[in-house]
Amino acid sequence: MSTGTVVQVIGAVVDVEFPQDSVPRVYDALKITGEGACNGLVLEVQQQLGGGVVRTIAMGSSDGLRRGLEVANSGSPITVPVGVATLGRIMNVLGEPIDEAGPIGEEERYVIHRAAPSYEDQSNSTELLETGIKVIDLVCPFAKGGKVGLFGGAGVGKTVNMMELINNIAKAHSGLSVFAGVGERTREGNDFYYEMEDSGVLDKVAMVYGQMNEPPGNRLRVALTGLSIAEKFRDEGRDVLLFVDNIYRYTLAGTEVSALLGRMPSAVGYQPTLAEEMGVLQERITSTKSGSITSVQAVYVPADDLTDPSPATTFAHLDATVVLSRQIASLGIYPAVDPLDSTSRQLDPQVVGQEHYDVANGVQTVLQRYKELKDIIAILGMDELSDDDKTMVFRARKIERFLSQPFFVAEVFTGSPGKYVSLKDTIRGFKGILDGEFDHIPEQAFYMVGSIDEAVEKANKKK
């Protein structure tokens, strides 16, 4: 194992000089072995500058780091604990426990930089994953072993939606889950831990956090740490759920690291390697013949602009996109999913069946027509519409309200108990509204209910 010395420190970027015959490889993990506060600090090699000098990114605070400190080369990339020992534990980017519950006690470690499964090893599945959330199951159904993105600006409910998905899927799904908190709030990580503990599924979840107060190196690599843990479960033949909150912070950390390394920025100031970095992560999140990884990723949309390079690059890798709209949230309709913007590859009559496809298509057609008529209504009023258009508007308003749903994880704020709606009930409810079966029920009865039966019951109570 070779040793070198720190020759330059610029924030999180540290240059280390080694003898010419033992220069570390790119991505090798180095460790500060000198005296002081930085003893044990891990550095990851990013570039070889020549003359035995390597440029590294610190995986922790570089406060107190100085030139001349001794650095040891581990000879391999960062390794993290994997396997059942990680379940119920909270770890940092290096796989070290941060929950004060003692050592992990793992039997095996994986390196965080791994090749994606080969083309022959990958497998596709068209099996649907029921979420219990009406708007998602109807308009943008999830595939088991697929990749899903939750897109939305600040404060429209990405994390709450993700928590509800974890609550509904992780409880109903007997498999294991891995949660990677990438550059998000520490408070949310804390809430998530207690949420899992209260629901009794903590022993099925491994948590990896690199929160927003951490250096960019941690935030850039923590998604790979979580993914490595998920890959181990998949390779053992299990079906695993991988939740990443938030993939945008992964991109942002890459931007910070890129700037620190002196690379020329590209469009909107992002790193020139944006597409490649995203591809390296996303290509590994895949299902093989032995097991599956179903991934749900929250994607922050800067300034609500879906054409921003970061969300635009993420779109290409996903099977389903759930777009959260500020306009829908402002109407008080939660989850604020935009049924006209959200898409899924699974919404195909050969996959979901003809009835589901027709109902979803019908809902989107009615909502689109209502959107077009809004300007006419605003200027001339409802009286100027034809009878057919009036009927369509009334049904569209009922559909809009019926797309809302009380969440289990939001019970504390709303005071109304959460509802899980089966796919069969969802299709039955929307089909009934489209066919005019519930034209006699006032639109208020459809707001914040589960199944259509609850809406009917609510209307009868009001009479």
Curated annotation (Swiss-Prot):
Record key words, sorted: ATP synthesis, ATP-binding, Cell inner membrane, Cell membrane, CF(1), Hydrogen ion transport, Ion transport, Membrane, Nucleotide-binding, Translocase, Transport
A GO cellular component entry from the record: proton-transporting ATP synthase complex
SMART domains named in the record: AAA (SM00382)
Catalyses which reaction(s): ATP + H2O + 4 H(+)(in) = ADP + phosphate + 5 H(+)(out)
Bilayer disposition of the protein: Peripheral membrane protein
Pfam families assigned: ATP-synt_ab, ATP-synt_ab_N, ATP-synt_VA_C
Enzyme Commission numbers on file: 7.1.2.2
Superkingdom of origin organism: Bacteria
Subcellular location as annotated: Cell inner membrane
GO molecular function: ATP binding; ATP hydrolysis activity; proton-transporting ATP synthase activity, rotational mechanism
Binding locations of ATP: 152-159
InterPro entries, per database record: AAA+_ATPase, ATP-synt_VA_C, ATP_synth_F1_bsu, ATPase_a/bsu_AS, ATPase_alpha/beta_chains, ATPase_F1/V1/A1_a/bsu_N, ATPase_F1/V1/A1_a/bsu_N_sf, ATPase_F1/V1/A1_a/bsu_nucl-bd
Family recorded in the similarity comment: Belongs to the ATPase alpha/beta chains family.
PANTHER family tied to this protein: ATP SYNTHASE, ATP SYNTHASE SUBUNIT BETA, MITOCHONDRIAL
Protein task: Produces ATP from ADP in the presence of a proton gradient across the membrane. The catalytic sites are hosted primarily by the beta subunits.
Subunit structure as annotated in this protein's UniProt entry: F-type ATPases have 2 components, CF(1) - the catalytic core - and CF(0) - the membrane proton channel. CF(1) has five subunits: alpha(3), beta(3), gamma(1), delta(1), epsilon(1). CF(0) has three main subunits: a(1), b(2) and c(9-12). The alpha and beta chains form an alternating ring which encloses part of the gamma chain. CF(1) is attached to CF(0) by a central stalk formed by the gamma and epsilon chains, while a peripheral stalk is formed by the delta and b chains.
Protein name listed in UniProt: ATP synthase subunit beta 1
Organism of provenance: Shewanella frigidimarina (strain NCIMB 400)
Gene: atpD1
